[in-house]
């Protein structure tokens, strides 16, 4: 494995197309500008970076570190775990498990970065996979790249929750759905966005996609599955086996991820803080647009997604 060392910080590549482990860093809000610059550079290069042994990190430190990467932003509909920005990811509902997705793409300016901290990890299973949507695009055959460049798709937070977790109690699914869709969003995105920092083209799809514009439901599904097969290809992914105290940070503009629900009844608890993003722009220069509601409402704490970028 290739290791790049600068000062006390090490960056060790762990996947051919995606993923690196960073050592020599104690995460928190007191990191030097130089260290934050190194972390951000590794994040843009490797798309997801991992830190072991961050057991000292609590809710305050988690959010303070997030502020070094940008403006933290709360989830548009789901209440936080701490009354501020940290979203609880746990084994009780598992509604986002067992599916490939990019966080919160049902709003126009979805998060730029997600920072996930492991609190309680089961004795087996519960891994997370990430896929590189930039290399998925660049490795497409040219005719498919040309096609993808021309497409737009509608993303929504309304989807079939029961199909994702068929063994869950109906009342638990109904309760989670009521919260998750307390505001029903529909946003039109380009299928290919131009990354605002790297200039790379990335595929913008995942399980929030309702339909590709201009196609029948069947044709849209077939085309989505075709593009997703390139995103999910094993050589385009990295898998992380969690330990308590681990932290993963990913570029949400250039990745999808998949939480594996395979740890039985064992508890799995993580906390996620997201950093505000900007409105995607396609290869033709056309930005994403919110279809409904008319505006993104302010969450119970903090700013609405995209508010810091628009300011």
Report residues per predicted region:
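Non-heme Fe(II) oxygenase catalytic core, chiefly the N-lobe of the double-stranded beta-helix
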Residues: 2-247, 253-311
